[in-house]
């Protein structure tokens, strides 16, 4: 057999450790970054929304807030401080948090309270509406909040609009709760901004480019716009026919322009219907559906209301004030443009209403020129949405893992909200929601929460976030999860919910602190921070590997006692092979911790010690009970277990020598189990597999009490899990359950169940499930099997049990990737579902062949073969419940372990064995599998067979072995479970070697009996054990007979000689399965304890069993494996000569420790540690060496094989880390994008706020502005004009600085204000400054425009006059650059025009760089393209633009601006010289 290279293994383990450490550090950093970003996002969003509300107040300039107060409030908002709620509310924070949480989750109550407040004329209803949006629903950043708010709006339609006498008037007034909330929601909805920008940006920019005239369609108003002299010049003499005719011509011309403009808007509206926000569409369709049912409302009126909501409340405000929505950012909108936009908005609304109401007769003529259904069709699309009950989510939820756990609310808002609710309660408007509100208010403290005085004195600049802000479980990220992300997975509790500081309090000079009040949700698990064991366990449970260790509570992070268990080493277990796995798992990657003691400490922490003590105590008591029972039935004698019997004698080379009385003979089962385990071991002798059975048993311990006792605090704590559970009750219950369970299918693996959830085991779990995942004994084989069926037998099991169901629903369910294993699982399903063995048989085949060669230790084929044979035993023997129980306890392995094993077993079973001795070997191999596994296999494989198969065959074949085993059992019986040898698992040599082995062992070991020697206490114990086992077996036999059809099927299974073997194995499997089931529970039941004690020596490592106390043997293997993994993953490989291994009688010689490869490796490492004076490492290595020295070479090879197998099985953990990292990176990127959006919104609101303030300032200076314009007209020299403009701007800047409104402005605001003043002033004098020579300039521009138009017809990108390099022609004709320069007319100040030119040049350079990434484009490449772009775009007034900028901005040009300006003027000059005729 191939030898496992310890150096390679160490290398891989070290790489794994380094990778895992770095990934964990990165994940920790990412978690911190995500939290910081989320916190910043929520705080910024809270402030931004308050600024927007403040802006609305400024625009309305209501009596309550003067512009100066709004400005002061804006400044205060920027300095908002966020403080944990308890600092002001003290212990009452919890009550308020619960109140807010329950209120938030009751949209109906909120809606009815707001309506009731309006009916009662509560003056603070509006501020409460703001609080609901900004605080309770956190500005709807999270989809959960958005969904709640949509429900509130739906209830408001029902309670407010539906009940109103004139809902349309109520809606148009815009002061009802629905209107305010809808406005807040639609303004903040990002998808709404996207829709508005996509729809309106282009048409509005085109309108600004052509804004020369008011598009007035009312003749009377048209005339009023001109002074008398202008009227006469334009229309002729007033009152004449010519005058009226000219006026009519102008009106028609304006109408034609307006129709073209509006059609452009409608076209964009239709084109972008696809991106209309789903949530708004849902609200509109809900309104239509709800109000259509009202008898007094006609359909036309309902439709008109939907039109009002859609156009008057959503689209038209954005058309009229695009700057406020960020649709237009840098192009100022002058008076003419604003008027034209208002005309467009008015026409859109009228067009939407065509057919539903008679329009203004004056507009009929213009409306007649439109397609009647143009806007109505858009409305139909929106209303036509199916009115489903649940609100849609606005977009793909990239923040799935995030959830809000706090509310941001100021103290005054909180008090206002509570008082509002109390006043609503006292009023009589609530109807059926009264009770709900009463319950909510009942829990609030009667008095107002007091502000702590300290708060007022200390400003909290950096209030802490409440704990809620932590990324929570991203469990779905487990590699195993099929879903890339389940909602819970990423649960990141961002507590930052920006709740608003009360909008109304503007007078305060100190910023009002915003309280961060926790909603009371518990802290969640952080993505990527699950331990290795948890991840691996989770995979098992979700993957359906019989192992269902993690209960749903655990998945959700709820505390549960089962948690402790599953935490132990389960993780790895599940994933890693089996028993050994468990042990491995213990040391799981957490090894990182590098301190051994940390390894075990999972949630269970110190449970280990207590558990051990408990176990010992219980063991003692139960032992007595078992002894009593056994004595009653004289089981020992029946089993033929005599103290002196030498094992070697018992073993006969053939199975059939002894005739067993009947299948029901208790000893048969036990013996068989043992035999099988032994046989498996034999076959595997050579294999690296770790101790055959021992591994499993050990694992069991993890789950079960067995191990836990043995477990040392430092290394094995993890293993203890189930032990810590209260022993007595559980055991009793479980035993009862087992008894009541019928058949394999129905019996549930207690361990499994328990781990799955804290409830008592459910019969539904099939034994099989327990079996599969863990056998470490045959790592290779198993691995292969596992790879084939990673979920091992238990696959469906998990589904069957209720617990599993829960788990599957759990957000964290991980499903292992589909693999052959799934098919295997499917085959095994029947077991889980109680259907009986028959279905099970199919899978055998799969197990036979490993899916891929084992990476490390190869496994003997023999080990794999023989599955079939095994199973049958089961059947013929029909284990009684008692037997099963005993067996189970003997091997108590966690189901998980069993699972993987079973796969191994199954594989071994598969091979038919014709020759008894050959059969025997497979049996041994099987034995090597953890018995649990064997069991699992059996149950899985067993199919109904004729029950005729002769017990005698079985018995004869295995009797001798069985006898031997029974002796062992005997000795085992009296020992505390931890001392027992784990018989079934113990590997045995192939039969031919068996006797020799025995003899040698006898020589070497203390007692005649190999097992007894293992336990170190020979015979006396055997009899007690035998009795106990028999007793238990009997008990269960009867139960099985009574209850389990599947057992019957199994019994039938053994029909052939091969079956004999099968029977053994199946029995074995069954037992072990049972054991596994029992294992999870600590042995409290007396029978159970005894059974636990039955753990047989076979389960122990060979050398350990011979040399050490049984107690040590059971534990030492796992312990050694854990420590060895730690040593290997921290070692630097040092080469040393390959050792030769001498073998004696076909067995590795374990007498010469110096031959042990591991020991030699460790010695080198110790030498290095001494050399480096690394005391910690020295201590760890020496302790590891002490543990390893006890084992013989064969066991050491098994140890390495087991570690290698565990290494392979940890792949899902690596995948989990990778997915968590990717998920966190995605979340972080999305949060940053959200933050960008919020910051942009805030910037837009602040700029518009500044613009409104400037407008107010300029209105107060209107007289001065008129004087300035008159003076400007009189000037002729360009320099004088420039100087005059500069002087007047400086005058206005000074006036602004002295204005009370601007006292609190920041430097940035002042700069924005100066820019706004410049734009406003230049807008007023634009025509005078742009066309100083008036008509002469206009005509000159027209000539150039026509010249360029002709050029554009003949000039192409590859025209020889341009000489554009060929490499750049692929991006021609550079449309984005053309569109940039075409908008230059929309900008009125020379600065803005230069910026427009700069953007065009930058766009061209970007496109050129894109075309040729190898070189940077230079001026020779750039200028020809610029010329071509100008020819194709042909912007109006090119010459006047050049003159305007040169006159008013030339002195300000510098740097980049100056360079691009020079290129631009050169291109214009060049264009002038091109002759289009040539």
Swiss-Prot record:
Q: Where in the cell is it found?
A: Membrane; Endosome
Q: Identify the Gene3D superfamilies for this entry.
A: 1.10.246.120, GTPase Activation - p120gap, domain 1, VPS9 domain
Membrane topology, from the record: Peripheral membrane protein
Q: Which GO terms describe its cellular component?
A: cytosol; endocytic vesicle; endosome; plasma membrane
Spell out the Basic and acidic residues composition-biased ranges.
Answer: 778-789, 889-902, 954-975, 997-1008
* Entries under Pfam families matching the protein: DUF5601, RasGAP, VPS9
Q: Which PANTHER family match?
A: GTPASE-ACTIVATING PROTEIN AND VPS9 DOMAIN-CONTAINING PROTEIN 1 (PTHR23101:SF25), RAB GDP/GTP EXCHANGE FACTOR (PTHR23101)
Name-wise, this protein is GTPase-activating protein and VPS9 domain-containing protein 1
UniProt source species: Homo sapiens (Human)
Q: Which gene encodes it?
A: GAPVD1
């Amino acid at each position: 057999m191939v030898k496992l290279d310890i150096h390679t293994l160490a290398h891989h383990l070290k790489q794994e450790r380094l990778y895992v450490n770095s990934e964990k550090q990165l994940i920790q950093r990412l978690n911190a970054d995500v939290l910081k970003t989320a916190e910043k996002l929520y705080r910024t969003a809270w402030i931004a929304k308050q600024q927007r509300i403040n802006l609305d107040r400024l625009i309305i300039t209501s009596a309550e807030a003067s512009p100066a107060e709004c400005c002061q409030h804006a400044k205060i908002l920027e300095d908002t401080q966020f403080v944990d709620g308890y600092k002001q509310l003290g212990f009452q924070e919890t009550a308020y948090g619960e109140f807010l949480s329950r209120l938030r989750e009751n949209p109906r109550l909120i809606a009815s309270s707001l309506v009731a407040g309006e009916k009662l004329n509560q003056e603070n209803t509006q501020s409460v509406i703001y609080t609901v949006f900004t605080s309770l629903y956190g500005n709807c950043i999270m989809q959960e909040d958005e969904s709640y708010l949509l429900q509130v709006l739906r209830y408001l339609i029902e309670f407010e609009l539906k009940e109103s006498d004139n809902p349309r008037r109520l809606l148009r007034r815009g002061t009802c709760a629905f209107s305010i909330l809808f406005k807040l929601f639609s303004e903040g909805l990002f998808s709404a901004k996207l829709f508005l920008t996509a729809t309106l940006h282009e048409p509005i920019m085109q309108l600004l480019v052509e804004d020369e005239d008011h598009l007035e369609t009312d003749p009377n108003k048209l005339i009023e716009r001109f002074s008398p002299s202008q009227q006469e010049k334009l229309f002729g003499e007033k009152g004449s026919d010519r005058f009226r005719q000219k006026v009519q011509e102008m009106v028609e011309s304006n109408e034609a322009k307006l129709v073209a403009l509006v059609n452009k808007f409608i076209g964009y509206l239709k084109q972008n219907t696809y991106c209309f926000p789903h949530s708004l569409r849902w609200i509109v369709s809900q309104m239509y559906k709800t109000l259509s049912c009202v008898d007094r409302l006609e359909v036309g009126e309902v439709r008109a209301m939907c039109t009002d909501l859609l156009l008057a409340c959503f689209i038209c405000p954005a058309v009229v004030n695009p700057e406020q929505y960020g649709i237009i950012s840098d192009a100022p909108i002058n008076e003419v443009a604003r008027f034209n936009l208002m005309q467009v908005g008015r026409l859109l609304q009228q067009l939407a209403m065509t057919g539903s109401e008679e329009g203004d007769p004056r507009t009929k003529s213009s409306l007649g020129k439109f397609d009647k259904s143009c806007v109505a069709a858009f409305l139909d699309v929106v209303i036509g949405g199916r009115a489903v009950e649940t609100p849609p989510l606005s977009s793909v939820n990239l923040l799935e893992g995030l959830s809000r756990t706090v509310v941001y609310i100021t103290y005054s808002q909180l008090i206002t909200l509570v008082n509002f609710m109390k006043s609503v309660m006292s009023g009589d408007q609530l109807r059926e929601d009264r009770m709900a509100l009463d319950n909510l208010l009942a829990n609030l403290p009667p008095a107002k929460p007091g502000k702590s005085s300290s708060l007022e004195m200390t400003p909290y600049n950096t209030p802490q976030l409440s704990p809620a802000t932590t990324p929570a479980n991203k469990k779905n990220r487990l590699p195993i999860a099929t879903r890339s992300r389940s909602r819970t997975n990423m649960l990141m509790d961002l507590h930052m919910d920006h709740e608003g500081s009360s909008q109304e309090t503007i007078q305060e000079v100190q910023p009002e602190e915003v309280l961060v009040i926790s909603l009371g949700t518990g802290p969640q698990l952080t993505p990527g921070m699950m331990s290795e064991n948890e991840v691996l366990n989770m995979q098992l449970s979700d993957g359906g590997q019989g192992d269902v260790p993690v209960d749903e509570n655990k998945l959700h992070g709820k505390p549960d006692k089962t948690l402790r268990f599953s935490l132990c080493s389960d993780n790895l277990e599940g994933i890693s092979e089996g028993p050994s796995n468990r042990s491995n798992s213990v040391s799981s990657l957490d090894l990182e911790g590098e301190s051994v003691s940390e390894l075990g400490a999972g949630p269970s922490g110190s449970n280990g010690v207590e558990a051990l003590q408990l176990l010992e105590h219980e063991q003692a008591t139960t032992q007595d009970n078992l002894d009593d029972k056994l004595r009653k039935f004289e089981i020992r004698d029946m089993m033929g277990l005599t103290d002196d019997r030498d094992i070697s004698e018992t073993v006969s080379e053939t199975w059939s020598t002894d005739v067993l009385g009947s299948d029901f003979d208790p000893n048969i089962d036990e013996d068989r189990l043992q035999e099988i385990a032994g046989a498996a071991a034999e076959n595997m002798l050579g294999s690296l597999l770790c101790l055959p059975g021992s591994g499993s048993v050990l694992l069991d311990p993890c789950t079960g009490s067995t191990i836990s006792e043995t477990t040392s605090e430092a290394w094995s704590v993890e293993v203890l899990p189930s032990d810590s559970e209260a022993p007595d009750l559980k055991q009793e219950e479980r035993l009862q359950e087992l008894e009541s369970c019928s058949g394999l299918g129905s019996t549930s693996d207690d361990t499994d169940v328990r781990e799955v959830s804290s409830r008592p085991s459910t019969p539904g779990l099939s034994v099989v499930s327990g079996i599969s995942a863990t056998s470490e004994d045959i790592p290779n084989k198993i691995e292969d099997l596992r790879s084939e069926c990673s979920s091992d037998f238990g696959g469906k099991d998990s589904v069957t049990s209720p617990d599993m169901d829960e788990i599957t629903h759990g957000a964290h369910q991980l499903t292992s990737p589909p693999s052959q294993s799934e098919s295997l699982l499917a085959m095994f399903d029947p077991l889980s579902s109680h259907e009986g063995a028959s279905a099970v048989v199919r899978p055998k085949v799969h197990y036979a062949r490993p899916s891929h060669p084992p990476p490390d230790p190869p496994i003997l084929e023999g080990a794999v073969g023989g599955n079939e044979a095994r199973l049958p035993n089961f059947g013929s023997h029909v284990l009684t419940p008692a037997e099963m129980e005993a067996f189970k306890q003997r091997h108590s392995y966690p189901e998980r372990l069993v699972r993987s094993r079973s796969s191994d077993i199954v594989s071994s079973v598969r091979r038919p064995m014709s020759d008894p001795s050959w059969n025997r070997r497979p049996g041994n191999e099987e034995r090597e599998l953890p018995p649990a596994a064997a069991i699992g296999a059996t149950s899985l494989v067993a199919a109904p067979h004729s029950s005729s198969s002769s017990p005698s065959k079985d018995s004869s074949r295995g009797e001798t072995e069985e006898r031997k085993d029974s002796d062992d059992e005997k000795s085992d019986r009296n020992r505390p479970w931890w001392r027992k040898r784990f018989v079934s698992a113990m590997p045995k040599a192939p039969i031919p070697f068996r006797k020799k082995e025995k003899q040698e062992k006898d020589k070497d070991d203390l007692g005649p009996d190999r097992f007894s020697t293992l336990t170190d206490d020979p015979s006396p114990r055997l009899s007690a054990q035998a009795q106990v086992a028999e007793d238990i077996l009997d008990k269960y036999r009867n139960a099985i007979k009574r209850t389990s059809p599947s057992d019957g099927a199994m019994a039938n299974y053994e029909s052939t000689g091969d079956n004999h073997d099968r029977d053994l194995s199946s029995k074995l499997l069954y037992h072990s399965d049972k054991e596994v089931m029992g294992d999870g529970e600590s042995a409290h039941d007396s029978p159970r304890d005894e059974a636990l004690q039955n753990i047989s020596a076979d389960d122990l490592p060979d050398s350990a069993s011979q040399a050490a106390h049984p107690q040590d043997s059971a534990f030492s293997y796992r312990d050694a494996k854990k420590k060895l993994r730690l040593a290997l993953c921290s070692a630097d490989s040092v080469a040393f000569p390959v050792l030769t291994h001498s073998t004696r009688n076909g067995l590795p010689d374990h007498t010469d420790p110096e031959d042990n490869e591991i020991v030699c490796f460790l010695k080198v490492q110790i030498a290095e540690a001494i050399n480096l004076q690394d005391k910690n490492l020295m201590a760890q290595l020496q302790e590891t060496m002490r543990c390893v020295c006890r084992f013989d070479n064969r066991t050491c090879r098994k140890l390495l094989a087991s570690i290698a197998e565990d290494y392979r099985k940890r792949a899902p953990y690596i995948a989990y880390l990778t997915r968590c990292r990717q998920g966190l990176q995605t979340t972080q990127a999305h949060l940053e994008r959200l933050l960008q959006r919020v910051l942009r919104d805030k910037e837009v609101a602040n700029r518009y706020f500044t613009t409104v303030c400037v407008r107010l300032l300029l209105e107060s200076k209107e007289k001065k502005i008129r004087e300035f314009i008159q003076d400007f007209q009189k000037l002729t020299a360009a320099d004088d004009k420039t100087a005059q403009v500069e002087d007047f701007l400086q005058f206005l800047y000074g006036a602004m600085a002295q204005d009370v409104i601007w006292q609190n402005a920041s430097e940035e605001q002042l700069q924005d204000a100066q820019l706004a003043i410049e734009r406003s002033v230049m807008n007023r004098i634009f025509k005078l400054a742009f066309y100083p020579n008036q008509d002469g300039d206009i005509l000159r521009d027209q000539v150039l425009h026509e010249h360029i138009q002709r050029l554009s017809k003949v000039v192409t990108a590859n025209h020889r006059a341009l000489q554009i390099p060929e490499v750049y022609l692929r991006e021609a004709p550079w449309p984005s650059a053309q569109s940039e320069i075409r908008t230059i007319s929309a900008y009125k100040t020379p600065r803005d025009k230069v910026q427009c030119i700069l953007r065009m040049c930058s766009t061209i350079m970007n496109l050129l760089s894109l075309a040729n990434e190898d070189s940077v484009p230079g001026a020779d490449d750039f200028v020809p393209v610029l010329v071509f772009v100008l020819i194709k775009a042909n912007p109006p007034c090119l010459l006047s633009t050049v003159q305007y900028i040169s006159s008013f901005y030339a002195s300000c040009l510098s740097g980049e601006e100056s360079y691009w300006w020079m290129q631009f003027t050169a291109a214009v000059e060049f264009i002038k010289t091109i002759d289009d005729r040539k």
